[in-house]
Amino acid sequence: MANTTGEPEEVSGALSPPSASAYVKLVLLGLIMCVSLAGNAILSLLVLKERALHKAPYYFLLDLCLADGIRSAVCFPFVLASVRHGSSWTFSALSCKIVAFMAVLFCFHAAFMLFCISVTRYMAIAHHRFYAKRMTLWTCAAVICMAWTLSVAMAFPPVFDVGTYKFIREEDQCIFEHRYFKANDTLGFMLMLAVLMAATHAVYGKLLLFEYRHRKMKPVQMVPAISQNWTFHGPGATGQAAANWIAGFGRGPMPPTLLGIRQNGHAASRRLLGMDEVKGEKQLGRMFYAITLLFLLLWSPYIVACYWRVFVKACAVPHRYLATAVWMSFAQAAVNPIVCFLLNKDLKKCLRTHAPCWGTGGAPAPREPYCVM
């Protein structure tokens, strides 16, 4: 099933011509590399250059793009070389461990980062004032550093043969050697990845329930005015009684202060949240959930194959299924820029600004009424 010699396979003699399946693998992985490097580079430059994108969600997106770009530039060329040499590793055992460490590092980093993003998306919708006050540049840097630290903690132990990194011939890459769970320690790593994915979708599910319960604004409740002598004061008063008294048409004492007109300090200091701002946060939430869902869909076949190896000892994973699952996990590094440019209007507008041949964006939409969140 996997290479169990303990050392990467070396190629001796002349290279044999690649088969048809090898050509397909080379073409697909080359296309994935080009799309990933170009798309992530363009997206990263836009976020760095445009001041309008210097916000917490785009800082997290920048981190994801840089990680995917580095993964494509560092890990994928070794896979191309192994496919070109007949599914064999032509480099040293140490380089195999380094490449495997980086591949696992970027996988767990994406999972941890997507979970943190889901939490911030929930905070942005459900507790917007707290989110706007606390989610500063330094907070974003702390979240990103935490995600990288946890990823290193997950990817580093196999370097010391705790769940061994080896070249897997069927996958054409250096990665975890998944064997029967009684003979290996990789089950814990796979469970951690599955728990992260489940927790991320649970947070988005909670966000969806929150939006469903708050899909309509509460109706205005009219409070009746209070009167004992036809002065009509209180929360429901309009001030007409006081105006009549000043004009000389009233009798008796001056009407009391209109308590309902005056706002307390806490209500007056509440920040008004524009409807366009609410729509922007929801748009970002949809974009990041699409990224999360694609991460799950593209990695799920490979995760199923890993669990198959861990729990099923008698039957090996079909070769075509495993090859398809591995290349789907590679494709995940290229889909984020495509999703972002399709679902994010701000990114498309910035891209049109820096690409005059695509035309300029239309006139900005008129500002909509405000609502208090």
Swiss-Prot record:
Looking at the UniProt entry, the stretches that span the membrane are 27-47, 60-80, 98-118, 140-160, 189-209, 288-308, 323-343
Report the principal subcellular site: membrane
Record-level Gene Ontology MF annotations:
G protein-coupled receptor activity; gonadotropin-releasing hormone receptor activity
The record's disulfide annotation reads C96-C174
Record has Glycoprotein as a keyword = yes
Membrane topology according to the record: Multi-pass membrane protein
Q: Which residues lie on this side of the membrane: Extracellular?
A: 1-26, 81-97, 161-188, 309-322
Glycosylation: residue positions: N3, N184
Annotated family: Belongs to the G-protein coupled receptor 1 family.
Q: What is this protein called?
A: Probable G-protein coupled receptor 173
Origin species, per record, is Homo sapiens (Human)
Instruction: Provide the organism lineage as a comma list.
Output: Eukaryota, Metazoa, Chordata, Craniata, Vertebrata
- Gene behind this protein: GPR173
